[in-house]
Amino acid sequence: MIQWFLKYRPRSLKDVENQDGAKKELQEWIESWLNGKPNAKAVLLHGPPGVGKTTLAEAVAHDYNLELLEMNASDSRKLQDIKGVAEKASVYGSIFGTRGKLILLDEVDGINVREDTGAIQGILELIEKTKYPIIMTANDPWNPALRELRNKTKMVGLNKLGKYPLRRLLKKICQAEKIICDDEALNYIIDTSEGDTRYAINMLQGIGEGYGKVTLDLVEAMARRKERELDPFETLRDIFWARYAWQAKNAATSAQIDYDMLIRWISENIPIQYDNIEDVWRAFDALSRASIFLKRAKGGDWDLLSYAYDLMSSGVAAAEIEKKKPNWKPKWKKYQFPSYIQLLSKSKDIRDTRDEIIKKLAIHSSFNKTLNDTYPFFLIFYKKYDKRLSLNTKEKEYLNSASKS
């Protein structure tokens, strides 16, 4: 099912509200390109999240019959990826019968200049050599890393959508989707969104589709969850109960725990949440793929981390086939801590005793080297040296037990 903020996004510039100044600047700029005398090779659209930067770029392509070549610069970070966009634009002709092409580089402020060496330089080269107009978007255009880009582009700022236009849009969506929404709830969504149209629509969809109506109590509960990180139990519930990919991924990325621990929590509770063995199989299949992407991401290709999150959240949530039925209702289950954590907790005292012994041994060597190289042999003949090490009763009991196992 499509997300509402995509379903109801403006297709044409005439449908974009509250951005008259930005629309005029973009129209003058794109027409200067089409007339062969561009007043700037690239535009940097900037504004807070959810104000419609990407939508505005897509509307320009639609209205002027331009083929849109889109790339998320913060995901495709490598220099060769950015150069690939230039090659596609310059080498390949349009297969859609359009007047030309428009290059869109989304979220350029998401580029990490330390990890993504050459990315900014690649964009600068693309701007210098481009045969087609380029639109870039950024939430924070004043990021120091973007200084050279600012100098090479025409900057166009976007406003937050005002309360009245946002109210009209939300009411229109409610009518189209046949969702009952209280006026108080609508006001709360508008105030909480602070001009973030995408957030407002997502909140409306999340509650409206889940409960069939939007009330102030439900909206307040959802808003409170957004303002804080979710504990592991809330995270699991939001993932397993999600009917849409974005709901599950939002839960995963809002979790208090990191991705490694989140995978352990999900793995432990999949058999608890899903009764159907095929659902369990599909969920573990998604989770195993997430583990593969996570391992590769840790190897240095951090672009793959997003795929790991997709699979451990949306992939696991989609495993339950019953969710496709309109009358599906989530099942409340009592989740449990990962057995891995329980085992670590139970063995903590034992491990602490072992570590104290190793510290006494590691006089001229590191702790890890002593643990891996010296300690296994020490277990064999420790009784000859226990007095020299001043071992206490607890440590002697541990060594007696460990040497027998």
Swiss-Prot record:
Alphabetical list of Pfam families matching this protein: AAA, RCF1-5-like_lid
InterPro entries the UniProt entry points to: AAA+_ATPase (IPR003593), ATPase_AAA_core (IPR003959), P-loop_NTPase (IPR027417), Rep_factor-C_lsu (IPR023935), RFC_lid (IPR047854)
Residues noted as binding ATP in the record, renumbered to the chain: G47, P48, P49, G50, V51, G52, K53, T54
Disulfide bonds: none
Molecular-function GO term, any one: DNA clamp loader activity
Highest taxon above the source species: Archaea
Keyword NAD: no
GO BP annotations, alphabetical order: DNA replication
Cited SUPFAM superfamilies: P-loop containing nucleoside triphosphate hydrolases
Keywords: ATP-binding, DNA replication, Nucleotide-binding
Complex formation: Heteromultimer composed of small subunits (RfcS) and large subunits (RfcL).
UniProt family annotation: Belongs to the activator 1 small subunits family. RfcL subfamily.
The protein, known as: Replication factor C large subunit
Lineage summary: Archaea, Thermoproteota, Thermoprotei, Sulfolobales, Sulfolobaceae
Gene: rfcL
